[in-house]
Protein backbone atom coordinates (compact mmCIF):
# COMPACT_ATOMS: atom_id res chain seq x y z
CA UNK A 1 0.00 0.00 0.00
CA UNK A 2 1.35 3.38 -0.97
CA UNK A 3 2.25 5.71 1.84
CA UNK A 4 0.05 8.81 1.97
CA UNK A 5 1.60 12.21 1.87
CA UNK A 6 1.26 14.63 4.77
CA UNK A 7 -1.20 16.66 2.71
CA UNK A 8 -3.33 13.59 2.02
CA UNK A 9 -3.36 12.62 5.70
CA UNK A 10 -4.46 16.11 6.71
CA UNK A 11 -7.23 16.10 4.12
CA UNK A 12 -8.37 12.66 5.30
CA UNK A 13 -8.42 13.83 8.94
CA UNK A 14 -10.47 16.87 8.01
CA UNK A 15 -12.87 14.68 6.05
CA UNK A 16 -13.18 12.28 9.00
CA UNK A 17 -13.86 15.12 11.43
CA UNK A 18 -16.49 16.56 9.10
CA UNK A 19 -18.09 13.13 8.91
CA UNK A 20 -18.14 12.92 12.71
CA UNK A 21 -19.65 16.39 12.92
CA UNK A 22 -22.36 15.54 10.39
CA UNK A 23 -23.10 12.26 12.17
CA UNK A 24 -23.55 14.12 15.46
CA UNK A 25 -25.86 16.63 13.81
CA UNK A 26 -27.84 13.79 12.23
CA UNK A 27 -28.28 12.32 15.70
CA UNK A 28 -29.77 15.56 16.95
CA UNK A 29 -26.69 16.95 18.72
CA UNK A 30 -26.16 20.70 18.37
CA UNK A 31 -22.70 21.74 17.16
CA UNK A 32 -22.58 25.51 17.63
CA UNK A 33 -20.35 27.57 15.40
CA UNK A 34 -16.85 27.68 16.83
CA UNK A 35 -17.01 24.28 18.56
CA UNK A 36 -13.52 22.79 18.77
CA UNK A 37 -12.97 19.40 17.16
CA UNK A 38 -11.49 18.24 20.47
CA UNK A 39 -14.98 18.63 21.97
CA UNK A 40 -16.60 16.17 19.55
CA UNK A 41 -15.87 13.24 21.86
CA UNK A 42 -17.92 14.79 24.66
CA UNK A 43 -20.69 15.57 22.19
CA UNK A 44 -21.07 11.86 21.43
CA UNK A 45 -22.53 11.43 24.93
CA UNK A 46 -25.40 13.71 23.95
CA UNK A 47 -26.67 11.33 21.27
CA UNK A 48 -30.12 10.02 22.13
CA UNK A 49 -30.42 6.22 22.09
CA UNK A 50 -30.90 5.10 18.51
CA UNK A 51 -30.35 8.58 17.12
CA UNK A 52 -33.12 10.66 15.58
CA UNK A 53 -33.71 8.29 12.69
CA UNK A 54 -35.59 5.40 14.24
CA UNK A 55 -35.38 7.10 17.63
CA UNK A 56 -36.79 4.77 20.25
CA UNK A 57 -38.35 6.88 22.99
CA UNK A 58 -41.18 4.48 23.69
CA UNK A 59 -40.00 4.04 27.29
CA UNK A 60 -39.08 7.68 27.88
CA UNK A 61 -41.05 9.38 30.64
CA UNK A 62 -39.30 12.75 30.62
CA UNK A 63 -39.10 15.03 27.61
CA UNK A 64 -37.63 17.86 29.68
CA UNK A 65 -35.84 20.26 27.27
CA UNK A 66 -36.02 17.49 24.64
CA UNK A 67 -36.54 19.76 21.64
CA UNK A 68 -35.50 23.07 23.19
CA UNK A 69 -33.80 25.82 21.19
CA UNK A 70 -35.07 24.42 17.86
CA UNK A 71 -33.45 21.02 18.44
CA UNK A 72 -35.14 18.19 16.48
CA UNK A 73 -38.07 20.40 15.51
CA UNK A 74 -38.03 19.05 11.96
CA UNK A 75 -38.38 15.48 13.24
CA UNK A 76 -40.94 15.85 16.02
CA UNK A 77 -43.33 13.43 14.34
CA UNK A 78 -40.75 10.64 14.83
CA UNK A 79 -40.70 11.05 18.61
CA UNK A 80 -42.77 8.54 20.58
CA UNK A 81 -44.21 10.34 23.61
CA UNK A 82 -46.74 7.70 24.65
CA UNK A 83 -45.17 7.12 28.08
CA UNK A 84 -44.21 10.71 28.72
CA UNK A 85 -45.18 12.24 32.04
CA UNK A 86 -42.91 15.31 32.07
CA UNK A 87 -43.23 17.64 29.09
CA UNK A 88 -41.81 20.69 30.86
CA UNK A 89 -39.64 22.95 28.67
CA UNK A 90 -39.93 20.43 25.82
CA UNK A 91 -39.91 23.10 23.10
CA UNK A 92 -38.43 25.92 25.19
CA UNK A 93 -37.02 28.80 23.13
CA UNK A 94 -37.71 27.10 19.81
CA UNK A 95 -38.21 30.36 17.99
CA UNK A 96 -38.38 28.68 14.57
CA UNK A 97 -41.24 26.39 15.58
CA UNK A 98 -44.48 27.38 13.83
CA UNK A 99 -46.64 24.30 14.36
CA UNK A 100 -46.58 21.04 16.30
CA UNK A 101 -47.88 17.65 15.12
CA UNK A 102 -50.23 15.61 17.26
CA UNK A 103 -48.41 14.26 20.32
CA UNK A 104 -49.51 11.49 22.67
CA UNK A 105 -49.54 13.28 26.03
CA UNK A 106 -52.20 11.16 27.73
CA UNK A 107 -49.92 10.35 30.68
CA UNK A 108 -48.50 13.84 31.06
CA UNK A 109 -48.67 15.42 34.51
CA UNK A 110 -46.47 18.46 34.03
CA UNK A 111 -46.67 20.76 31.03
CA UNK A 112 -44.85 23.68 32.65
CA UNK A 113 -43.11 25.94 30.12
CA UNK A 114 -43.68 23.36 27.36
CA UNK A 115 -43.86 26.04 24.65
CA UNK A 116 -42.14 28.86 26.58
CA UNK A 117 -40.91 31.56 24.20
CA UNK A 118 -41.96 29.78 20.99
CA UNK A 119 -42.60 33.19 19.48
CA UNK A 120 -43.35 31.94 15.94
CA UNK A 121 -45.81 29.24 17.02
CA UNK A 122 -49.20 29.86 15.40
CA UNK A 123 -51.08 26.64 16.15
CA UNK A 124 -50.98 23.86 18.73
CA UNK A 125 -52.70 20.47 18.47
CA UNK A 126 -55.49 19.20 20.67
CA UNK A 127 -53.26 17.80 23.42
CA UNK A 128 -54.54 15.30 25.98
CA UNK A 129 -53.83 17.12 29.23
CA UNK A 130 -56.42 15.40 31.41
CA UNK A 131 -53.79 14.18 33.91
CA UNK A 132 -51.91 17.47 34.01
CA UNK A 133 -51.40 19.28 37.31
CA UNK A 134 -48.76 21.88 36.40
CA UNK A 135 -49.47 24.25 33.50
CA UNK A 136 -47.26 27.11 34.70
CA UNK A 137 -45.86 29.23 31.82
CA UNK A 138 -46.99 26.59 29.32
CA UNK A 139 -47.51 29.08 26.48
CA UNK A 140 -45.58 32.01 27.91
CA UNK A 141 -44.12 34.25 25.24
CA UNK A 142 -46.02 32.60 22.38
CA UNK A 143 -46.60 35.98 20.80
CA UNK A 144 -48.00 34.64 17.51
CA UNK A 145 -50.74 32.44 18.99
CA UNK A 146 -54.22 33.84 18.40
CA UNK A 147 -56.23 30.93 19.80
CA UNK A 148 -55.78 27.83 21.96
CA UNK A 149 -57.71 24.56 21.49
CA UNK A 150 -59.89 23.45 24.39
CA UNK A 151 -57.57 21.79 26.91
CA UNK A 152 -58.67 19.53 29.75
CA UNK A 153 -57.09 21.21 32.78
CA UNK A 154 -59.56 19.89 35.34
CA UNK A 155 -56.76 18.47 37.53
CA UNK A 156 -54.50 21.49 37.29
CA UNK A 157 -53.35 23.29 40.43
CA UNK A 158 -50.58 25.50 39.01
CA UNK A 159 -51.51 27.96 36.26
CA UNK A 160 -49.05 30.77 36.95
CA UNK A 161 -48.10 32.54 33.71
CA UNK A 162 -49.80 29.94 31.51
CA UNK A 163 -50.64 32.51 28.82
CA UNK A 164 -48.29 35.27 29.93
CA UNK A 165 -47.19 37.57 27.10
CA UNK A 166 -49.42 35.85 24.56
CA UNK A 167 -49.93 39.29 23.10
CA UNK A 168 -51.92 38.08 20.08
CA UNK A 169 -54.29 35.84 22.05
CA UNK A 170 -57.72 37.34 21.38
CA UNK A 171 -60.10 34.61 22.53
CA UNK A 172 -60.74 33.27 26.01
CA UNK A 173 -59.18 29.77 26.20
CA UNK A 174 -61.88 28.76 28.71
CA UNK A 175 -59.64 26.56 30.82
CA UNK A 176 -60.89 24.70 33.89
CA UNK A 177 -59.17 26.21 36.92
CA UNK A 178 -61.46 24.78 39.60
CA UNK A 179 -58.50 23.23 41.47
CA UNK A 180 -56.05 26.00 40.68
CA UNK A 181 -54.41 27.62 43.69
CA UNK A 182 -51.94 29.83 41.82
CA UNK A 183 -53.35 31.87 38.93
CA UNK A 184 -50.73 34.62 39.13
CA UNK A 185 -49.68 36.13 35.78
CA UNK A 186 -52.25 33.85 34.09
CA UNK A 187 -53.35 36.26 31.35
CA UNK A 188 -50.59 38.87 31.75
CA UNK A 189 -50.54 41.11 28.65
CA UNK A 190 -53.11 39.14 26.64
CA UNK A 191 -55.31 40.76 23.98
CA UNK A 192 -58.86 39.56 24.56
CA UNK A 193 -61.79 41.84 25.40
CA UNK A 194 -63.74 39.54 27.68
CA UNK A 195 -63.31 36.48 29.85
CA UNK A 196 -66.40 34.32 29.84
CA UNK A 197 -65.53 31.94 32.65
CA UNK A 198 -62.86 31.57 35.31
CA UNK A 199 -63.27 29.33 38.34
CA UNK A 200 -61.25 30.87 41.15
CA UNK A 201 -62.88 29.02 44.05
CA UNK A 202 -59.57 27.36 45.06
CA UNK A 203 -57.30 30.28 44.18
CA UNK A 204 -55.11 31.98 46.80
CA UNK A 205 -52.79 33.93 44.50
CA UNK A 206 -54.25 36.15 41.75
CA UNK A 207 -51.35 38.60 41.54
CA UNK A 208 -50.66 40.06 38.07
CA UNK A 209 -53.33 37.75 36.61
CA UNK A 210 -54.72 40.40 34.21
CA UNK A 211 -51.86 42.89 34.30
CA UNK A 212 -51.71 45.03 31.15
CA UNK A 213 -54.71 43.38 29.50
CA UNK A 214 -55.37 46.75 27.91
CA UNK A 215 -58.30 45.55 25.76
CA UNK A 216 -60.14 43.73 28.56
CA UNK A 217 -63.60 45.22 29.12
CA UNK A 218 -65.57 42.66 31.15
CA UNK A 219 -64.98 39.94 33.72
CA UNK A 220 -67.23 37.10 34.87
CA UNK A 221 -68.48 36.71 38.42
CA UNK A 222 -65.74 35.06 40.47
CA UNK A 223 -65.57 33.39 43.88
CA UNK A 224 -62.45 34.87 45.43
CA UNK A 225 -63.15 33.90 49.01
CA UNK A 226 -59.72 32.25 49.40
CA UNK A 227 -57.60 34.82 47.59
CA UNK A 228 -55.12 36.77 49.71
CA UNK A 229 -52.80 38.21 47.06
CA UNK A 230 -54.19 40.74 44.57
CA UNK A 231 -50.91 42.54 43.86
CA UNK A 232 -51.17 44.24 40.43
CA UNK A 233 -54.07 41.94 39.51
CA UNK A 234 -55.86 44.43 37.23
CA UNK A 235 -53.12 47.01 36.82
CA UNK A 236 -53.21 48.84 33.47
CA UNK A 237 -56.49 47.24 32.39
CA UNK A 238 -57.29 50.59 30.84
CA UNK A 239 -60.68 49.58 29.36
CA UNK A 240 -62.06 47.66 32.32
CA UNK A 241 -65.14 49.54 33.54
CA UNK A 242 -66.42 47.30 36.30
CA UNK A 243 -65.30 44.46 38.52
CA UNK A 244 -67.76 42.23 40.37
CA UNK A 245 -67.99 42.21 44.14
CA UNK A 246 -65.10 39.85 44.48
CA UNK A 247 -63.09 40.81 47.51
CA UNK A 248 -64.65 38.68 50.20
CA UNK A 249 -61.53 36.91 51.47
CA UNK A 250 -61.96 35.54 54.98
CA UNK A 251 -58.29 35.77 55.95
CA UNK A 252 -56.92 38.35 58.36
CA UNK A 253 -55.10 40.31 55.68
CA UNK A 254 -55.05 40.59 51.88
CA UNK A 255 -52.55 42.31 49.63
CA UNK A 256 -54.01 45.02 47.39
CA UNK A 257 -50.83 46.79 46.29
CA UNK A 258 -51.31 48.37 42.83
CA UNK A 259 -54.41 46.21 42.27
CA UNK A 260 -56.32 48.74 40.15
CA UNK A 261 -53.52 51.13 39.29
CA UNK A 262 -54.11 52.84 35.92
CA UNK A 263 -57.55 51.27 35.43
CA UNK A 264 -58.58 54.54 33.85
CA UNK A 265 -62.16 53.47 32.93
CA UNK A 266 -63.09 51.85 36.24
CA UNK A 267 -66.04 53.60 37.89
CA UNK A 268 -66.94 51.54 40.95
CA UNK A 269 -65.22 49.09 43.31
CA UNK A 270 -66.49 47.19 46.33
CA UNK A 271 -63.93 45.58 48.64
CA UNK A 272 -64.17 43.65 51.90
CA UNK A 273 -61.81 43.96 54.85
CA UNK A 274 -58.20 44.33 53.80
CA UNK A 275 -56.72 43.81 57.25
CA UNK A 276 -53.32 45.16 58.24
CA UNK A 277 -51.82 45.54 54.77
CA UNK A 278 -51.59 49.11 53.42
CA UNK A 279 -53.22 50.12 50.14
CA UNK A 280 -50.10 51.07 48.20
CA UNK A 281 -51.19 52.68 44.89
CA UNK A 282 -54.34 50.55 44.95
CA UNK A 283 -56.49 53.05 43.01
CA UNK A 284 -53.73 55.27 41.68
CA UNK A 285 -54.58 56.66 38.26
CA UNK A 286 -58.22 55.51 38.34
CA UNK A 287 -59.31 58.79 36.80
CA UNK A 288 -62.96 57.77 36.25
CA UNK A 289 -63.50 56.16 39.66
CA UNK A 290 -66.64 57.54 41.33
CA UNK A 291 -67.49 55.12 44.14
CA UNK A 292 -65.39 53.03 46.52
CA UNK A 293 -66.82 50.84 49.25
CA UNK A 294 -64.18 49.25 51.44
CA UNK A 295 -63.79 47.48 54.77
CA UNK A 296 -60.99 47.86 57.30
CA UNK A 297 -57.64 48.96 55.88
CA UNK A 298 -54.35 50.70 56.70
CA UNK A 299 -53.55 54.03 55.07
CA UNK A 300 -50.81 55.25 52.74
CA UNK A 301 -50.67 58.54 50.86
CA UNK A 302 -50.71 57.13 47.32
CA UNK A 303 -53.92 55.09 47.55
CA UNK A 304 -56.19 57.57 45.74
CA UNK A 305 -53.63 59.57 43.77
CA UNK A 306 -55.18 60.67 40.48
CA UNK A 307 -58.76 59.77 41.47
CA UNK A 308 -60.05 63.21 40.55
CA UNK A 309 -63.68 62.10 40.02
CA UNK A 310 -64.09 60.16 43.25
CA UNK A 311 -67.29 61.26 44.98
CA UNK A 312 -68.47 58.43 47.19
CA UNK A 313 -66.19 56.89 49.79
CA UNK A 314 -67.99 54.30 51.90
CA UNK A 315 -65.83 52.75 54.64
CA UNK A 316 -67.52 49.69 56.17
CA UNK A 317 -64.73 49.04 58.67
CA UNK A 318 -62.09 50.84 60.70
CA UNK A 319 -59.30 52.87 59.08
CA UNK A 320 -55.89 52.50 60.73
CA UNK A 321 -53.49 55.40 60.20
CA UNK A 322 -49.97 54.57 58.99
CA UNK A 323 -47.54 57.21 57.74
CA UNK A 324 -50.13 59.37 55.95
CA UNK A 325 -53.57 59.63 54.41
CA UNK A 326 -54.19 61.96 51.49
CA UNK A 327 -57.40 62.52 49.53
CA UNK A 328 -56.52 66.00 48.36
CA UNK A 329 -56.35 64.42 44.89
CA UNK A 330 -60.12 63.87 45.15
CA UNK A 331 -61.75 67.35 45.23
CA UNK A 332 -65.21 65.98 44.35
CA UNK A 333 -65.75 63.95 47.52
CA UNK A 334 -69.18 64.55 49.01
CA UNK A 335 -69.62 65.90 52.52
CA UNK A 336 -71.09 62.56 53.53
CA UNK A 337 -67.99 60.78 52.26
CA UNK A 338 -65.67 63.14 54.13
CA UNK A 339 -67.59 62.61 57.35
CA UNK A 340 -67.51 58.85 56.73
CA UNK A 341 -63.74 59.00 56.48
CA UNK A 342 -63.26 60.98 59.68
CA UNK A 343 -65.69 58.75 61.55
CA UNK A 344 -63.99 55.54 60.41
CA UNK A 345 -60.50 56.51 61.57
CA UNK A 346 -59.28 54.61 64.61
CA UNK A 347 -59.13 56.69 67.82
CA UNK A 348 -55.58 57.77 68.66
CA UNK A 349 -56.42 59.41 72.00
CA UNK A 350 -53.57 58.96 74.43
CA UNK A 351 -51.07 58.40 71.64
CA UNK A 352 -49.24 60.54 69.14
CA UNK A 353 -51.19 62.84 66.86
CA UNK A 354 -51.52 62.14 63.12
CA UNK A 355 -52.43 64.27 60.12
CA UNK A 356 -55.30 63.54 57.74
CA UNK A 357 -54.84 65.41 54.46
CA UNK A 358 -58.18 66.29 52.87
CA UNK A 359 -57.03 69.26 50.80
CA UNK A 360 -58.32 72.81 50.91
CA UNK A 361 -61.30 72.14 48.62
CA UNK A 362 -62.57 69.30 50.79
CA UNK A 363 -61.83 71.11 54.06
CA UNK A 364 -63.97 74.03 52.93
CA UNK A 365 -66.98 71.70 52.69
CA UNK A 366 -66.89 70.73 56.38
CA UNK A 367 -68.37 72.53 59.35
CA UNK A 368 -66.39 73.06 62.53
CA UNK A 369 -68.51 70.37 64.18
CA UNK A 370 -67.67 67.87 61.47
CA UNK A 371 -63.96 68.65 61.71
CA UNK A 372 -64.15 68.09 65.45
CA UNK A 373 -64.82 64.38 64.81
CA UNK A 374 -61.17 63.99 63.82
CA UNK A 375 -59.78 66.42 66.37
CA UNK A 376 -61.45 64.50 69.21
CA UNK A 377 -59.55 61.38 68.12
CA UNK A 378 -56.18 63.16 68.13
CA UNK A 379 -55.93 63.98 64.43
CA UNK A 380 -55.08 67.23 62.72
CA UNK A 381 -56.60 68.17 59.38
CA UNK A 382 -54.83 69.68 56.41
Predicted regions and their residues:
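Long, low-complexity, intrinsically disordered polar/charged segments
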Residues: 1-12, 342-367
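Surface-exposed receptor/substrate recognition regions of extracellular proteins
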Residues: 1-65
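Structural signature of tandem-repeat unit edges
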Residues: 50-60, 70-85, 95-109, 119-133, ...
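Register-specific detector for alpha-helical tandem repeat solenoids, activating on a conserved position
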Residues: 64, 88-89, 112-113, 136-137, ...
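Extracellular/surface-exposed low-complexity segments
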Residues: 363-382
